[in-house]
């Protein structure tokens, strides 16, 4: 079982040497040459510096296509027409599974076709120099966004290629994404990624790391998401990471989302060591979207309003075409502009929402209880503790496909649309907190004239895509049972 100890320089070099032959572009990686390339970049392309010095939330979309020139064109469009402050490069699914041969076939097919045969940018196949061409061609900093349980070679190639931010982590890119990777193995893989980022940082090239906050993206209780962020942050900090962006995915209730983002920042600064700079990122709604673009814009606007009130350091935007899959560049840019409009109109207003302090206090209590259980499960070692906590169910993620998590915890919304826990299973929360959740869900059940049941859970999963927040019986979102004018 891995422990939360820093990899030695010899261990880092040995693993890197073993990885070089996994695909031929791995042999292009030269650390000293990479340092020199990063040092040649202007301040405007240094991700951590741009993010950490901003005085309002920065916007970043998701975007990735197979071919280099098309990826450059896409990101330039989002930069120039969408006003993106930070840019992404989303990696394809074959690369996420380390299937570089299949990625190569898809890249070759895409080059000879008007169709994209991959759902992202195969950075390992492109290699170091193509990555540098991408970085040189753009004005804004660029982040690697992927979903890869074993991202070691991807990190080697992209960091050498000039990327200065790398998303993911051993829990957030395992539990929500895959069945076939055990948590101990992904922790070991990500210790290498984080140590590599730390090695760059120690040479004056700060690599920003961003754990994936939304997890499964489906009604994740805030305290569970924040606990995972803190664990991944601690693991990264041990390996020398000094710029950490902790993530959170919108659940849809404005008060709860603002409270959660404030709790995330506060607890991040509390649990992570002093030399770490903590920033936060807010992901606009990651669940199902309405098929109608006008309604989808309403969902995006709620995300923008939430960001204006909570003021995270970064917002990952969505488009009105989420329902149909990968959006057009025009729709992606429009999502950026919609979010920016909401933020710019609201950010200077003094908006006082009742209930935020109480909700934040509850989230913090829950998160501390989960963190205490993790430390106890590992006798103070966070790596061992999180493995044991997931194994026992003391920590869990709803709707997770991974065999490393029990997936027994179930959420549902209360009468205000805040995400509560309907089924706790073995989650390590005290009885008085469980009673609060049960009481809030009981109020909703009374309003709706039905018993608390799994039907509530299922109704809530589909509610926003159906044009509501709460999955009321019969599709009626009015607590009083009146007719809805939404259809």
UniProtKB/Swiss-Prot annotation:
Enzyme class: isomerase
Catalytic activity, EC: 5.4.99.1
Top-rank taxon, per record: Archaea
Keywords: Cobalamin, Cobalt, Isomerase
InterPro entries named in the record: Cbl-dep_enz_cat (IPR016176), Glu_mut_E (IPR006396), Glu_mut_E_C_dom_sf (IPR014714)
Family: Belongs to the methylaspartate mutase GlmE subunit family.
HAMAP family assigned: Me_Asp_mutase_E
Its biological purpose: Catalyzes the carbon skeleton rearrangement of L-glutamate to L-threo-3-methylaspartate ((2S,3S)-3-methylaspartate).
Name of the protein this chain belongs to: Glutamate mutase epsilon subunit
Species of the source: Haloarcula marismortui (strain ATCC 43049 / DSM 3752 / JCM 8966 / VKM B-1809)
Lineage, opening ranks: Archaea, Methanobacteriati, Methanobacteriota, Stenosarchaea group, Halobacteria
């Amino acid at each position: 079982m891995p422990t939360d100890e820093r990899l030695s320089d010899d261990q880092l070099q040995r693993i890197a040497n073993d990885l070089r032959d996994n695909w031929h572009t791995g042999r292009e990686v030269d650390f000293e040459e990479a340092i020199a390339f990063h040092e040649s970049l202007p301040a405007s392309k240094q991700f951590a510096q741009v993010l950490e010095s901003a005085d309002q939330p920065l916007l970043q979309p998701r975007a990735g296509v197979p071919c280099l020139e098309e990826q450059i064109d896409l990101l330039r469009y989002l930069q120039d027409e969408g006003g993106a402050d930070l840019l992404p490069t989303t990696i394809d699914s074959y690369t996420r599974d380390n299937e570089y041969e299949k990625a190569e076939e898809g890249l070759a097919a895409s080059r000879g076709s008007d169709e994209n045969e991959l759902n992202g940018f195969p950075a390992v196949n492109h290699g170091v120099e193509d990555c540098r061409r991408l970085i040189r061609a753009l004005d804004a900093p660029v982040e690697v966004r992927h979903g890869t349980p074993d991202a070691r070679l991807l990190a080697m190639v992209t960091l050498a290629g000039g990327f200065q931010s790398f998303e993911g982590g051993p829990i957030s890119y395992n539990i929500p994404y895959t069945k076939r990777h055990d948590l101990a193995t992904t922790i070991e893989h990500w210790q290498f990624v984080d140590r590599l980022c730390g090695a760059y940082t120690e040479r004056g090239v700060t690599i920003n790391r961003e754990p994936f906050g939304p997890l499964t993206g489906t009604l994740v209780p805030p305290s569970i998401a924040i606990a995972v962020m803190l664990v991944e942050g601690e693991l990264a900090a041990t390996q020398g990471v000094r710029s950490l962006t902790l993530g959170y995915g919108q659940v849809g209730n404005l008060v709860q989302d603002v409270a959660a983002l404030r709790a995330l920042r506060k607890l991040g600064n509390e649990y992570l060591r002093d030399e770490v700079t903590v920033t936060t990122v807010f992901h606009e709604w990651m669940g199902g979207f309405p098929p109608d673009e006008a309604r989808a814009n309403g969902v995006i606007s709620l995300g923008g309003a939430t960001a204006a009130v909570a003021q995270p350091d970064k917002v990952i935007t969505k488009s009105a075409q989420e329902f149909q899959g990968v959006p057009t560049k025009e729709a992606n840019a429009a999502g950026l502009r919609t979010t920016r409009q909401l933020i710019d109109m609201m950010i200077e207003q003094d908006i006082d929402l009742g209930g935020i302090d109480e909700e934040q206090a509850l989230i913090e209590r829950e998160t501390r209880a989960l963190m205490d259980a993790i430390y106890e499960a590992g006798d103070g070692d966070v790596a061992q503790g999180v493995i044991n906590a997931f194994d026992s169910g003391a920590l869990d993620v709803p709707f997770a496909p991974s065999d490393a998590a029990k997936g027994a915890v179930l959420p549902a919304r209360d009468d205000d649309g805040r995400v509560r826990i309907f089924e706790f299973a073995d989650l390590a929360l005290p009885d008085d907190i469980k009673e609060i959740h049960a009481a809030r869900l009981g109020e909703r059940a009374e309003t709706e004239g039905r018993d608390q049941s799994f039907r509530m859970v299922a109704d809530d999963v589909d509610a926003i895509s159906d044009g509501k927040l709460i999955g009321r019986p019969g599709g009626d979102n009015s607590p009083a049972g009146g007719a809805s004018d939404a259809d």
